[in-house]
Structures are given as C-alpha cells and as structure tokens.
Regions:
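Conserved beta-strand hairpin/beta-sheet module of binuclear metal-dependent hydrolase folds
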Residues: 14-75, 152-167
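Actinobacteria-biased recognition of intrinsically disordered, low-complexity terminal regions
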Residues: 1-20
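Active-site HxH/HxHxD metal-binding segment of metal-dependent hydrolases
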Residues: 37-43, 62-139, 158-162
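C-terminal regulatory/interaction regions
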Residues: 236-283
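Metallo-beta-lactamase
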Residues: 54-59, 64-66, 137-235
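Histidine-centered divalent metal-coordination motifs
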Residues: 85-91, 146, 207, 275
C-alpha cells in the first residue's frame, strides 16, 4: 500500500500515453494503458521488448481489454510471444483479444491465463527457464508473494547492469499489496531476497516510473515491511496468537493504517491480513 498522501494517479511526463510506445531502456519501451487509479497508479505499463534490429517483438502484460490500447500495442513488427507477470485483470483482461490481433501465444505461470494463437502452443512459464525471442535473452524468475503466480523477467543484456520487469512485485512508487488469500508475505520476502541478489539493475515495474537500482529498492521495501510488522505487533498487544478474524483485521487496520485514503482501505486490510497470517505462522 502506498504511503498516505501520495498521488497515485499522476502521470510522469515520460510515460504519457500517446498511443506510441516510449523507449525507457535500450531493449524496452512502454505503452501506458488508460486505466489510472488508486491501485494502478498512472496505469498499467505494457512493455514492448526487442533487440536493436530485431524483426519481431515481445510484449509483456497487454493490460486491460481496451481496444485502442491493444490496437496501438499490436501496431509494428510481429509480436513473437506475449508474457504475463501475474493474473490480475489490469494485466490480463486484454490478453485473449491481443492474441487474436497478433497471432502471438500468451504465456503465463497460471495455465488459466495462457492463450494459444493460430495453432501456436502457449505453455505455462517456468521459473528458471530462459526465453529466446526478438533477439533477446529473457530469464524467467518466479517471484510469488503479491500473488501466487507472480513472475518477473530479467533482461541481463539490457545495458551495463541489465533490467528486470518486476510486475507488481516492485512498483515504481509506493509499495505493493499482498493480495490475500492468494498472496503470501513469507513468499514475498523470499522473492525480494532473490531480486536483491541480481544487483544494481534497472527496475521496470508494471505501475509507476522505472527506477535505477533494484537492490537498493528492495532494501527499502524490506525496511518498510519490517516497520509495518513492528506496528502490527504493537497493535496486537496481548491478542498476539489470536485467530485471524475479520474483527481483528479491522482493529489492526484502524490502528496501523488509520490515515490511509479511502480508496486504499481494502488494500490496507489485505496487507494486514497477510501480516497477521505471517506472524501466526511463527515469524
């Protein structure tokens, strides 16, 4: 959940949705979907990946089922494959239509969000595999936590330090929600450790501006989580170990996130529920 008072819907100038992907690194361009909001920041960032001179492209997260956005995203060299960071609708709702527009298979960790196209198979993504497409090496990283199927994509050849498309695992502004019941704080912290080990690579998030040092961002995220857990422990007091009921979630949310804006209250409750379950597991 983003800090209170943060304007989650402002659009960075470099990400304005003009209908044409804007280059953000040597190998990645972004087309911003027209779906700004409290949970999507300035909107979902659909990424277009290709090596210089490549005749095909890779698209990551087609985004919402918006015809104008999908048509603009499909315009250009042939899309070889579509990759999905996780199952949420702001990333996947347009995937089936985009597969029809481009003839490109859609691959996701969750088989329910894989779409074959024009007899081209769409196998589920596997953590640890390397995809070779559009002149690129794309390393698939299983990074569950935000959701159980959350996946990141490492481009080791993108500039001197590479880049990582982090989906909603690491955002360009604020911090992400652990989407209960599918998400897991324990898994999320493990995923942060894995991302930090990559080093000072460029962060290409699904929401918010790109960032310069993944390892530094991850350290900030971990400090934020530790601080929130300390607040939750304090709010629990002598109720530590009690069953995680909705009444307990409400009480802790009011104590820890009392100043959160109304549009983010549901996300705050999800985060509290995830933290309570984490503590109940013996953290």
């Amino acid at each position: 959940v983003t800090p209170p008072g943060d304007d989650r819907t402002r659009r960075p100038a470099h990400a304005a949705s003009s209908g044409v992907p804007v280059r953000v690194t040597g190998l990645a361009s972004v087309l911003l979907a027209p779906n700004p909001g409290p949970m999507t920041l300035d909107g979902t960032r659909s990424y277009v990946l290709a090596a210089p001179g490549a005749r095909t492209r890779v698209v990551v997260d087609p985004g919402p089922d918006d015809v104008a956005h999908l048509t603009a995203l499909a315009d250009g060299p042939r899309v070889e494959v579509v990759l999905i960071t996780h199952r949420h609708a702001d990333h996947t709702a347009g995937a089936a239509r985009f597969a029809e527009l481009t003839g490109a298979p859609v691959r996701a960790a969750d088989p329910a969000h894989c779409h074959p196209a024009r007899s081209r198979e769409a196998t589920p993504l596997r953590g640890g595999e390397t995809i070779h497409a559009a002149g690129l090496r794309i390393e698939v990283l299983a990074t569950p936590g935000h959701t159980g199927d959350s996946t990141s994509f490492h481009l080791p050849d993108d500039g001197p330090h590479g880049s990582v498309l982090t989906g909603d695992t690491v955002l360009g502004r604020g911090t992400t929600v652990i989407a209960e019941p599918d998400g897991s704080l324990r898994d999320y912290l493990t995923s942060l450790d894995a991302l930090e080990s990559i080093g000072a690579t460029t962060v290409l998030p699904a929401h918010g501006p790109h960032l310069g040092d993944l390892s530094a961002v991850v350290r900030t995220y971990r400090e934020h989580r530790a601080g929130r857990l300390a607040q939750v422990r304090t709010a629990l007091g002598d109720r530590a170990g009690d069953p995680v009921t909705e009444a307990l979630v409400d009480d802790v949310t009011a104590s820890v996130y009392g100043d959160v804006v109304p549009g983010l209250l549901s996300a705050a409750r999800q985060s509290v529920r995830a933290q309570l379950r984490y503590l109940a597991e013996g953290a």
